[in-house]
């Protein structure tokens, strides 16, 4: 298995104007990511608009990613659901495709208790044989799992890491105080990921599952590489670009701003599926302004 660390792009799912999946654009996006030295890929996460994909479409996206990637970089496949049985079904499916790990979110909408959240992860863990990255994203799930709960979840043998999207850079240190094993800690917040790396330590078991790297994969990957090489000046220069773009790409519900940016620089349709909608004119101008400042258009 690959070492799971570094910048993993939370891939968008490109759509055609009729809202069907644009398979050619998706395959081209993967090639472009790999050619820009991205460390890994995450299909069917939040940025993929996964809740709007049918199960058949979900399977197709994962299959395409596995086929085109062809083991050149590791894949962490999203297999989340607020239904435990559906999460098990999806995790078993991605396991059958020999991906490197599954990304499983804290269950959304149901608002389970801490015990219910733990039992959800334990059930997925016990029903499968794949390494699992737990995913905490309170803006989407309405629950911010506590450090104690996350440490309990991470104590399960094959739950090997965490993606935390809170932007709380104290979380890596808090978890280190509670855990008796080494885990990989991914930031899910582009704006604070460099600080998250620093708090995770210099050993390299850290990274970012990124929205921004859809647009600037090389800059984002170079930032992580510079951090590991202890080149803080280079890392901080790259971080400024990541931070500026992150602010623009979250001006409206994600991934609509990212898709609009990619329509300007990568010839990918800005189409998103309802209930998401394309950017307002005001927000289009915000994205365009940032892309111009970064000399991307």
Curated annotation (Swiss-Prot):
Annotated pyruvate binding sites: 47, 209
BP terms from Gene Ontology: diaminopimelate biosynthetic process; lysine biosynthetic process via diaminopimelate
Pathway listed: Amino-acid biosynthesis; L-lysine biosynthesis via DAP pathway; (S)-tetrahydrodipicolinate from L-aspartate: step 3/4
Keyword Lyase: yes
Active site annotation, chain numbering: 135, 163
GO CC annotation terms, alphabetical: cytoplasm
Site (Part of a proton relay during catalysis): 46, 109
Assigned protein family: Belongs to the DapA family.
Protein name listed in UniProt: 4-hydroxy-tetrahydrodipicolinate synthase
Phylogenetic placement of the source organism: Bacteria, Pseudomonadati, Pseudomonadota, Alphaproteobacteria, Rickettsiales
């Amino acid at each position: 298995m690959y070492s799971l660390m570094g910048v993993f792009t939370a891939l968008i799912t490109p759509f055609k104007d009729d809202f069907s999946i644009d398979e050619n654009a998706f395959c081209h996006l993967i090639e472009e990511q790999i050619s820009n030295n991205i460390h890994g890929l995450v299909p069917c996460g939040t940025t993929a608009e996964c809740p709007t994909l049918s199960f058949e479409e979900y399977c197709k996206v994962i299959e395409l990613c596995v086929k085109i990637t062809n083991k050149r970089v590791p894949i962490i496949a999203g297999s989340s659901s607020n239904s435990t049985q559906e999460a098990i079904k999806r995790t078993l499916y991605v396991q059958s495709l020999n991906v490197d790990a599954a990304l499983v979110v804290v269950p959304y909408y149901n608002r389970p208790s801490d015990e219910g959240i733990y039992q959800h992860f334990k059930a997925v863990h016990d029903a499968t044989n794949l390494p699992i990255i737990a995913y905490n994203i309170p803006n989407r799930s309405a629950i911010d799992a506590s450090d104690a709960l996350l440490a309990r979840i991470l104590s399960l043998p094959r739950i090997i890491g965490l993606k935390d999207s809170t932007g709380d850079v104290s979380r890596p240190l808090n978890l280190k105080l509670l855990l008796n094993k080494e885990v990989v800690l991914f930031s899910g917040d582009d704006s604070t990921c460099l600080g998250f790396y620093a708090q995770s330590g210099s050993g390299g078991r850290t990274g970012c599952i990124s929205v921004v790297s859809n647009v600037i994969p090389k800059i984002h990957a170079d930032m992580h590489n510079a951090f590991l090489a202890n080149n803080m000046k280079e890392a901080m220069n790259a971080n400024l670009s990541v931070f500026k773009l992150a602010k623009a790409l979250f001006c409206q519900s994600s991934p609509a701003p990212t898709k609009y940016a990619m329509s300007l620089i990568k010839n990918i349709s800005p189409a998103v599926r309802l209930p998401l909608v394309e950017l307002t004119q005001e927000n289009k101008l915000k994205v365009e302004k940032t892309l111009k400042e970064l000399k991307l258009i």
